[in-house]
C-alpha cells in the first residue's frame, strides 16, 4: 500500500477577507501559519516522513510546506515547484469579495463560478495588471499556457500531465510524497483519483491546513482516504469553506 498526503495551504490573507484569490500571490495569516504548524505536528505524530514534496509557485502553498516540514524536522526534503499546481485562475473575479459578488450576481451564479466543473468565470485581458505574463516567475511559460481565467476542467487539464509524468511515477517507485497546493488544484487531483463525476465535484470542499491522506494500491487507485485531526473541527472547517461564496456568509 502506498500513501500520498495532500495539504491545502493554511489560511491566506484573502481567505480571511473572503476574496477570490486565484494566482494572486498573497501570504498566510497568523492563523494560517498556525495551521501549517499544526499540519506538521499531526504528520510527525502520525509517523509520516517524505522522500519528495511538490508545491505551486505561490507563496501561501510554499510557506505552508516549509513550515510543515520544519515542524517535522524534515526541511531537507527535496521540493519541486511547478505552476501546474497553482490555484485555479479566477480571471476577473480575482480580488473581489465572494459574499459581495454573490449579492451582485446571486448565490447560484457564484456557486457555479466557484464549484462547477466546466464553466469559467469572466476573463481578464492580457493588458490587465493581474495577467500572469507580467510576472517573472512565469517567464518560461508559453503564452498559450498562461490563463486568462480557468474552470476546474481547465485546472484538471494542466494538472494531470504533471501528475502523470512527474508525481505518479515517484509514488509507484515507493517514494513517500506530499503535495502542498490549493483548493482547486487539489480538487482536480481528487476528482481524478476518486473518479468523481463532473456534477458531484461541486460538493467537494477542502479545508485549509489539514492533511488529507490517501492510501493507494499499486495502480494508484484509492483504498481509503482520511483527514488527520479532530473529526468535529474538520467538519466545521469543511462547512466554512462551503459557505464562503454565499451572500449571507
Curated annotation (Swiss-Prot):
Pathway: Carbohydrate degradation; glycolysis; pyruvate from D-glyceraldehyde 3-phosphate: step 3/5. Substrate binds at residues 8-15, 21-22, 60, 87-90, 98, 114-115, 183-184. It holds the Pfam family His_Phos_1. The keyword Isomerase applies. The keyword Isomerase applies. InterPro entries: His_Pase_superF_clade-1, His_PPase_superfam, PG/BPGM_mutase_AS, Phosphogly_mut1. The active site is at residues 9, 87. GO terms for molecular function: phosphoglycerate mutase activity. It catalyses: (2R)-2-phosphoglycerate = (2R)-3-phosphoglycerate. Keywords: Gluconeogenesis, Glycolysis, Isomerase. GO terms for biological process: gluconeogenesis; glycolytic process. The record marks 182 as: Transition state stabilizer. It comes from the Bacteria. Its EC number is 5.4.2.11. Catalyzes the interconversion of 2-phosphoglycerate and 3-phosphoglycerate. HAMAP family: PGAM_GpmA. Belongs to the phosphoglycerate mutase family. BPG-dependent PGAM subfamily. This is 2,3-bisphosphoglycerate-dependent phosphoglycerate mutase 2. It comes from Nitrosomonas europaea (strain ATCC 19718 / CIP 103999 / KCTC 2705 / NBRC 14298).
